[in-house]
Amino acid sequence: SLDRGTTESIDNSIPFFAELGKMNIETTLQGFYTNAKISGSENQKVYEKYLKIKSNLNDENLDLLEKEIKNNVTKNAEITEEINNKRDKLTIRKYLYTANFALVNPKYEVSPYIALTEIPDANLKLLDTISKTLDPKVAKSKYGKRLKEWIKERRTNEEN
């Protein structure tokens, strides 16, 4: 991430997916995070596609949270159960979307990164499938290796 220095603002850094070659980050001091435009990284483009859908899923979760807070006043058991069911389905959608995204983008280093950061506790078969479908170059990358190590560590811990 790119850090603008010491400030009281919550948008002190710009997260981006770096790769070899020339990259360009343009922004303003007033909107350091929100106005950032990043170019020169194919992985960043792919990551931004993922983040758009993740943002939509987060919005759905916030809507459920709002309903839950409102329901805390009336304490309607049916509404509570409905909210919990919707949240469970949303969690499943998030996991499936994330896994599918990683599986259909095996040529990008961002795929194992997303698997590691978004669904590290997913079913081992799913993580293993993601790892095995990675392009050989990606499998040898930092996050490809970390994903493989994470799967091995989880297998060891689950066997004990």
Segments (PLM) and residue ranges:
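A non-transmembrane, solvent-exposed segment enriched in polar/low-complexity residues
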Residues: 1-82
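Charged, long alpha-helical assembly modules
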Residues: 96-160
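An accessory alpha-helical subdomain
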Residues: 65-101, 112, 118
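A generic structural micro-environment signature
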Residues: 22-24, 31, 89, 125, ...
